[in-house]
Structures are given as structure tokens and as C-alpha cells.
Amino acid sequence: MSSYAPREIPLDIRLMQGTSRALFWLVALGCLFVAGHWLMQRNWWDIRAVRLQGDLQRISPVTVRAEALPQLRGNFLTINLAQAQRVFESLPWVRTAVVQRLWPMQLAVTLQAQQPVAIWREPGSAAQLVNTQGQAFTANLGEVQGLGLPQLSGPAGTSAQVLQMSQKLQPLMQEFHQTVATLAQGSGGNWSVQTRSGLSIDLGSAPDSAATQTRLKQFMTLMPQLEARYGRSIDSVDLRYPNGFAVHLQGVDLPGMNKTSNKTPQPAGRKD
């Protein structure tokens, strides 16, 4: 019985077979790609509803339909969820948004609303609001009328710092039945506050220092006695003095009050 060794396929034929197989798979993949692209572009995949959930107290569905939905690009399969998230987060009163696909052909959008705690002003810019994180955001100020929000102001980008200072001062003010109405940090670093009763207080450059806090408490304690003594309300007080404070009464100017010296006190950090 004879046996035959398998014939070796010539190199040119092997190359032709390999090329044919490669071309076949390329054509097959191309057809699949074209078919997939065609399927994804059909209106079968159009987004048919957007479900809003979360904190919607200040977020109007009308605003969402008018401003957000026209900016969404793609269908259920092709929409870029990160880009859609940015669209929703650009809406007034929206702090964060989470966008997810929801079968069949829907988007679920979970919104977290901004929580305003103050009105913010900085040089050269329109008034904004400040949220609980100290971030300034733009919204219709008319929507917060009646909330009694304090007004804060300072250099650009300092909203968080000014809000933090306001929160430090408020408990001390409340001890003396006062409430912060405005707090401002000037370009030179000095701070001033006005209470809802109309009292203006110049706090100097370190309002949270122990020395300033002590002088503020001393003044608040003496304020009723001073007003009773002079028969007038106090308009303003300057706490930038190392050993006391200076007050201004309605219609009366006082030279300065210093408990340790008869001479007119100088603002802290200043020499005669």
C-alpha cells in the first residue's frame, strides 16, 4: 500500500487565499457597520420622553423644554450623556444633573437645585446669588424676594470667603438681637457690615480676630446705654481702634471713645 505526502500549496495561492479571506471580512465588517449606522439613524431610536426627578421646586419644566431639550443631540443610542448633563446644568437654578438612558427610548434626568443663602455682588458684574457651598450662580433675583437674604460683596472670586465670614459673624450678632443685612469686603481688605436695624459697623481687616470680636461684643453690650445717654440711635461704629471704638449718633459726631486713654484713639495698625 502506497502513501502520498500532502502537496504543499504554492506561496502565490496561499497569498491569494489570505487576501480573499481578508477582503471577505473587511466587506462583511463594512456591511455590518453600514447596517448598524443605518439602524441607529432610524427614528425607531428617537428619544420619546424626558423624565425629570429630584428637587424641582425652582426648576420650571417649561424652561427645561424651551432651553435644554433643543440642545440635545442624537437619539437614544447615540446621545452623549456627558454633553447632555452639561446642557441641563447650564439651566438657571440647576446645581447638578445626572442623565441616564431609560428603556424604552427615554431619558431620566435627576436634578439638584441651587439653595440660595445670599445675594452676591462684585465690581463690574451683575448681581448673582450664592449657594450653600459659597458658589455664585446666576438666576432671577425676583424669585428670592421676600426671603430676606443678606447681601454680600467683595472682589471677584471671593464669594465663598465672604459667605464664611458672614456665617461667623451671624451667631455673635444674634446674641444681641441683630441680624447681618449686608457684609462687604473692600478692595483694600477692610470689612464692613450693616445690620437689619440700620447699624453700620466698620470691622477692619481682621473681623474674625479675637481683638475685633472682643471690641464688637463690648460695643454691643454698651450700645443700649450709649443710646439712652445721648437720646439718639447709633448710626455707625468704627472698631478699627486698638483700645476701643468710635461711634456716630444720628445728628451728633463723637470724637472717639477709648476706655484706656483720654486721647482720640487711632485705628489699629496706625501710629501717631
From Swiss-Prot:
UniProt cross-references to PANTHER family, sorted A to Z: CELL DIVISION PROTEIN FTSQ
Cell location: Cell inner membrane
Bilayer-crossing regions: 21-40
The protein's assembly and partners: Part of a complex composed of FtsB, FtsL and FtsQ.
Organism in which the protein naturally occurs: Thiomonas arsenitoxydans (strain DSM 22701 / CIP 110005 / 3As)
Name of the gene this protein is made from: ftsQ
Major localisation: membrane
Protein name according to UniProt: Cell division protein FtsQ
Residue ranges of domain POTRA in the record: 45-114
InterPro entries: Cell_div_FtsQ/DivIB_C (IPR005548), FtsQ (IPR026579), FtsQ_C_sf (IPR045335), POTRA (IPR034746), POTRA_FtsQ_type (IPR013685)
